[in-house]
């Protein structure tokens, strides 16, 4: 239980916990946001009661998820000031602009037009309601952009210089800082993963309906949308993931070496499985393609990349990265996280292919119980891939919280050990960590019960809002009714 006496480690665990919980809801919000927009577009074109019910259903699921995403996200930002005061002072001049933009532009865009989706169905035109659905999704994508801009600066700092006393990074060029070397590849890689999560969640819900024989028309429409959606995003992921890996190899060689457990320079193999023995600095029980990773990163099986020992001996990172530092790095954790992400992508690709083929081959998925069961559990694949990818990105950056990337100005970096709040003690962190666990457990159980209830109720065509909407359209009157009625048929 040595970690209970290490305040920096406890602060890292607490932040990781809040980020992991938050990252349950962010992928669903962005992924399901597009599902909402797609089904609202279908309703706008068809004006059918079935498509109206489908749109209402996805709006409810999205709203429950969005609310928890906001709550867990606020906690993360407050922890910068409570547990990571030195870090907050160091990056404050850089992070102020993107975090303010995220709140003022993206969050307000999402919130305002989500209000339209919830309460404006009978009060605005169908076209305005449709535009609102797309703006909610656009707002969520913009929110992800500003957060990734901030995080990417930590990975490859640019457009900044150190203050005279070395305690603060000062912004010198906003565009250089915002669009640093890793912003674009990391943004497309991340958002595409979140869209895959949304597609698989929709696929799972539809597959459950097919298995139970419920709402079969809605389920088949959803399966068709989700399988095409998943196929497109999965194919794009091949491109985005490749570019992201190439960028890591160029900009963060220590992380790249940890991802493949490379201590010494070599043409890096592509491991299917393996275990890094950190004491002997070897990958044991490996199944690998020799030079496979080198080929993916450079196009040649013979390209050699430096290992951790080579990087320490080069002196490129000074006293921050030595042989002693290497002995303390969680290399196996990064190795396993990275390869879990890759393995999950393999399952994503297989599930996507099967769902697409058997959906468009006379709708055979409707009678294939084994494929329905696979689809029901399939959201676990992108979820684990997303969490494992986040672990790889953040733990692989160690021992720095602001990485001294190859393209960054000399000296703009910050060690994790120098980032935490000195006044926060280990007992305080341990107690608040336990409280966070209990509160988040309560929240996620509550969210799960709400979503499960919504799924059991399903898309209801004969809602109170339908009849009242039709009457209102004919008479020119409009009553507020309950929440269900307020998200009834658009364009009244």
Name each model feature, range by range.
Residues 1-492:
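Polytopic transmembrane helical bundles with strong interfacial aromatic enrichment
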């Amino acid at each position: 239980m040595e970690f209970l006496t290490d305040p920096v480690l406890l602060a890292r665990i607490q932040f990781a916990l809040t980020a992991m919980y938050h990252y349950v809801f962010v992928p669903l919000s962005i992924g399901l946001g597009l599902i909402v927009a797609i089904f609202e577009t279908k309703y706008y074109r068809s004006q059918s009661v079935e498509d109206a019910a489908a749109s209402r259903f996805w709006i409810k699921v999205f709203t429950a998820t969005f609310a928890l995403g906001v709550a867990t996200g606020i906690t993360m930002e407050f922890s910068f000031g409570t547990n990571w005061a030195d870090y907050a002072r160091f990056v404050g001049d850089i992070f102020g602009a993107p975090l303010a933009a995220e709140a003022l532009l993206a969050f307000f865009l999402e919130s305002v037009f989500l209000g339209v989706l919830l309460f404006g169905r009978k009060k605005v035109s169908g076209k305005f309601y449709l535009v609102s659905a797309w703006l909610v999704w656009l707002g969520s994508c913009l929110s992800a952009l500003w957060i990734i801009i901030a995080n990417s600066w930590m990975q490859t700092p640019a457009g900044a210089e150190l203050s005279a006393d070395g305690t603060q990074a000062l912004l010198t060029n906003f565009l250089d800082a915002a669009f640093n070397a890793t912003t674009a590849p990391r943004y497309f890689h991340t958002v595409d993963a979140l869209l895959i999560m949304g597609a698989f969640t929709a696929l799972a819900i539809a597959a459950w309906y097919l298995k139970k024989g419920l709402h079969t028309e809605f389920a088949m429409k959803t399966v068709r949308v989700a399988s095409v959606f998943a196929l497109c995003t999965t194919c794009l992921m091949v491109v985005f993931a490749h570019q992201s890996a190439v960028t890591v190899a160029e900009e963060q060689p220590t992380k790249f070496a940890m991802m493949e457990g490379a201590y010494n320079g070599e043409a890096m193999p592509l491991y299917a499985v393996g275990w890094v023995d950190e004491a002997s600095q070897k990958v044991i029980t490996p199944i690998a393609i020799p030079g496979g990773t080198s080929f993916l990163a450079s196009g040649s099986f013979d390209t050699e990349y430096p290992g951790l020992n080579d990087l320490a001996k080069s002196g490129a990172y000074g006293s921050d990265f030595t042989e002693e530092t290497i002995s303390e790095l969680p290399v196996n954790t990064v190795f396993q996280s990275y390869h879990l992400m890759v393995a999950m992508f393999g399952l994503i690709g297989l599930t996507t292919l099967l769902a697409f083929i058997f959906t468009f081959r006379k709708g055979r998925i409707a009678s294939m119980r084994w494929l329905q069961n696979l689809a029901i559990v399939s959201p676990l694949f992108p979820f684990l891939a997303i969490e494992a990818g986040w672990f790889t990105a953040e733990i692989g950056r160690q021992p720095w919280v602001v990485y001294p990337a190859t393209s960054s100005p000399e000296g703009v970096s910050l060690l994790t050990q120098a980032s935490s709040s000195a006044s926060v003690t280990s007992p305080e962190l341990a107690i608040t960590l336990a409280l966070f666990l209990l509160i988040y457990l309560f929240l996620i159980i509550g969210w799960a019960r709400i979503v499960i209830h919504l799924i059991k109720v399903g898309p209801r065509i004969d809602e109170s809002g339908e009849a009242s909407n039709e009457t209102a359209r004919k008479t020119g009157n409009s009553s507020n009714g309950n929440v269900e009625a307020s998200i009834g048929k658009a364009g009244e």
